[in-house]
Amino acid sequence: MAKKTKKTEEITKKFGDERRKALDDALKNIEKDFGKGAVMRLGERAEQKVQVMSSGSLALDIALGAGGYPKGRIIEIYGPESSGKTTVALHAVAQTQKEGGIAAFIDAEHALDPAYAAALGVNIDELLLSQPDSGEQGLEIAGKLIDSGAVDLVVVDSVAALVPRAEIDGDIGDSHVGLQARMMSQAMRKLSASINKTKTIAIFINQLREKVGIMFGNPETTPGGRALKFYASVRLDVRGNTQIKGTGDKKDQNVGKETKIKVVKNKVAPPFKEAFVEIMYGEGISQTGELVKIASDIGIIQKAGAWFSYNGEKIGQGSENAKKYLADHPEIFAEIDHKVRVHYGLVELDEDDVVEDTQVEDTQVEDTSDELILDLDSTIEIEE
């Protein structure tokens, strides 16, 4: 029995060595034909963690789970008309430029407002803009920009406005069944590899349509076929909720709207999380407003009655005054923003955070020691 077991082990080892040699030969041939790195073991990759870029909204970064939009991936932003889709995308453009990157905007709808984009923080002098004549032209331009490797973000607004050239050349009323879907399917096949290789973020804004004859379930769908749904790593559903009333002289006016952004698909973090943001008309997402709400919910900003305070110092009575204080003190805004991101695990702890935590622990130990000394003194007095 022992001899049989030993023989079996020798045969297994022999076949194992032969398979390993065959694999090594195959890898060498692949590397020779297609270049180094064509096939590699996953653990050999220099960067295994997904790189992200902030969306420009703290609440959305938290909902995305990874801290922002993943680099080298396709993002789809869709929703009803005037829900804030382009606003969300423009904040990503502004954030890209803020981090020193280059952004491009493919305006297929021919409706980009430069003044509004500038109000959101976009440097319109540095923004690459294209207003294509057809869907093929717009996607071809996007592809060339991505292939260059010099562009960090490409926004296409919108998929529904990418009209195939055959439809433009034809007459109104002509049937072009599946033409746009085939165009998008081909574009996704060509662009996906280049997007991943160059680590470019590609954001596609999309509209909503309704399926005809749907009695049960959700009749809503997005145009352009199913290819974009499959290739997108993140899909965001943007919906406007309640209107926001102004204060003071504007108390009877609508100055913005509360918007819900739902992550309906996420390949880099758990999906189905929601972000609630305030989109102010003419200003975009209120970054101070979302910071005050989130920081007060987790206790970084303390709230007592109508007063908000930070580190024992009052920063405003009412949320509007607290938002104004943070807007006037960008260094305090950045400090609180960093603490919130650390709390949700979106950024790694730095030395200052570690020192601060250590000081808090030391204080707690000292307080406990004082209490123990007082208890011992009280006991001695009672015994005497």
Swiss-Prot record:
Main localization (coarse):
cytoplasm
Please name one Pfam family that this protein belongs to. RecA_C
Residues that span the membrane, as ranges: none
The answer, when asked if S-adenosyl-L-methionine is one of the entry's keywords, is no
Which residues of the sequence carry a binding annotation for ATP? G79, P80, E81, S82, S83, G84, K85, T86
InterPro entries reported for this sequence: AAA+_ATPase (IPR003593), DNA_recomb/repair_RecA (IPR013765), DNA_recomb/repair_RecA_CS (IPR020584), P-loop_NTPase (IPR027417), RecA-like_C (IPR049261), RecA-like_N (IPR049428), RecA_ATP-bd (IPR020588), RecA_C_sf (IPR023400)
- Where in the cell? Cytoplasm
Q: Which HAMAP family match?
A: RecA
Similarity comment text for this entry: Belongs to the RecA family.
- The name under which this protein is listed is Protein RecA
- The protein's organism comes out as Streptococcus thermophilus (strain ATCC BAA-250 / LMG 18311)
